[in-house]
């Protein structure tokens, strides 16, 4: 059985722990308790291959900026998460999380994950954001951010309804077992005759 280490990063309160608990236990946790570090494990079949998926939950809070990278060595794939209803967490994907991951693990695939997709159409949430002249992050914005940080894929999910949840982890595994073919840069230069 192939073992894959998947580390989940992103701002505090974007839903990283809920994502992992909902995926591994099929239950949505009730209250928010900030994570320092937690590990989860799941044995799954993807494309007919048995996989032991080691899931590393990290703290998004700035207090842990020096501690968090200790979980990065030997990572096979990163999930960089932002909340669809938190534009600031979306901006931090390229402002903080992408650069942090690239610095510590430059050649490891990244899946960009928009969490809380069930809240995008929630009227109360929309009104709260509008009061601050903000809007939920669109799917198209997610695709743009994926290209900006050179992620393998952009996916959205809801830990509450489990919509898109299994796909996130299946695609994370696929990014490791079927890595994307790197485009070789053609060498342009001049020929001296």
From Swiss-Prot:
Function of the molecule: Overexpression promotes the formation of filopodia and membrane ruffles.
GO MF annotations in UniProt: GTP binding; GTPase activity; protein kinase binding
Cellular-component GO terms for this entry: cell projection; cytoplasmic vesicle; cytoskeleton; plasma membrane
PROSITE patterns: RHO
Membrane topology: Lipid-anchor
Record family assignment: Belongs to the small GTPase superfamily. Rho family.
Localization per Swiss-Prot or TrEMBL: Cell membrane
Name of the protein described by the UniProt record: Rho-related protein rac1C
Primary localisation category: membrane
Lipid-attached positions, S-geranylgeranyl cysteine: 190
Organism: Dictyostelium discoideum (Social amoeba)
Gene: rac1C
CDD domains, per the entry: Rac1_like
Modified residues (Cysteine methyl ester): 190
Classification via InterPro entries: P-loop_NTPase (IPR027417), Small_GTP-bd (IPR005225), Small_GTPase (IPR001806), Small_GTPase_Rho (IPR003578)
Lipoprotein in keyword set: yes
Motif (Effector region): 32-40
List of residues binding GTP: 11-17, 57-61, 115-118
GO BP annotation list: actin filament organization; cortical cytoskeleton organization; establishment or maintenance of cell polarity; mitotic cytokinesis; regulation of actin cytoskeleton organization; regulation of cell shape; response to bacterium; response to imidacloprid
Intrachain S-S bonds: none
Keyword Zinc among UniProt keywords: no
Residues cleaved off as propeptide: 191-193
Assembly information from the UniProt record: Interacts with pakB. Interacts (in GTP-bound form) with rgaA.
Keywords: Cell membrane, GTP-binding, Lipoprotein, Membrane, Methylation, Nucleotide-binding, Prenylation
């Amino acid at each position: 059985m192939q073992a894959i280490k998947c580390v989940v990063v992103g701002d505090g309160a974007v839903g990283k722990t809920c994502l992992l608990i909902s995926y591994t236990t099929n239950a949505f946790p009730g209250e928010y308790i900030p994570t320092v570090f937690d590990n989860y494990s799941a044995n799954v079949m993807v494309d007919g291959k048995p996989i032991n998926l080691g899931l590393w939950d990290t703290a998004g809070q700035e207090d842990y900026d020096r501690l968090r990278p200790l979980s990065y060595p030997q990572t096979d794939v990163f999930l960089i998460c932002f909340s669809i209803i938190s534009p600031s967490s979306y901006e931090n994907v390229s402002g903080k999380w992408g650069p942090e991951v690239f610095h510590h693990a430059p050649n490891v695939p990244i899946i960009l994950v928009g969490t809380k997709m069930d809240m995008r159409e929630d009227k109360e949430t929309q009104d709260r954001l509008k009061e601050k002249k903000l809007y939920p992050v669109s799917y198209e914005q997610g695709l743009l951010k994926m290209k900006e940080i050179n992620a393998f894929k952009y996916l959205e999910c809801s830990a509450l309804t489990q919509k898109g949840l299994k796909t996130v982890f299946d695609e994370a595994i696929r990014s490791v077992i079927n890595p994307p073919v790197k485009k070789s840069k053609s060498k342009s230069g001049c020929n001296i005759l």
